[in-house]
Design a protein with these regions (language model features):
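N-terminal organellar transit peptides
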Residues: 1-26, 30-118
Length: 118
């Protein structure tokens, strides 16, 4: 995945959230090197459970739902590694849908290292 590529990149990876890092963009932002994830004070990070869709018979739909649950587990693990929170804490944040954080809130919860005003 692109996240894995960025995490394994030998040079420092710096991410800067100028507007919003929502959905998979929030996962990519987590690939920043330690101390290198910054967000605008008026920026947002939005996290949620994985989404998907499927067509087919009931077995196909169950398989798709299981895969979406696995994606959610992987995403929550990435957030947990970055923030120092447990996977269960992350799942609690997203249990009721989208979880929005301002730049200041994202930093306070470990989803960003620095807040900037520009």
């Amino acid at each position: 995945t692109l996240y894995n590529f960025l995490k394994s990149y030998k040079a420092k990876v710096e991410t800067e959230v100028i507007g919003m890092a929502g959905s998979i963009a929030s996962v990519l932002a987590m690939a920043a090197s330690p101390g290198k994830l910054s967000i605008a004070r008026n920026g947002f990070v939005v996290i949620h459970r994985a989404w998907g869709g499927a067509i087919g018979n009931s077995d196909d739909l169950r398989a798709a739902a299981n895969m979406i649950d696995k994606y959610t587990d992987q995403i929550c693990d990435i957030y947990a590694q970055r923030t120092g929170k447990s996977v269960e804490e992350i799942k609690g944040l997203i249990a009721n849908g989208d979880y929005w954080m301002t730049g200041v809130e994202a930093q306070a919860q470990g989803f960003a290292d620095k807040v900037f005003n520009d």
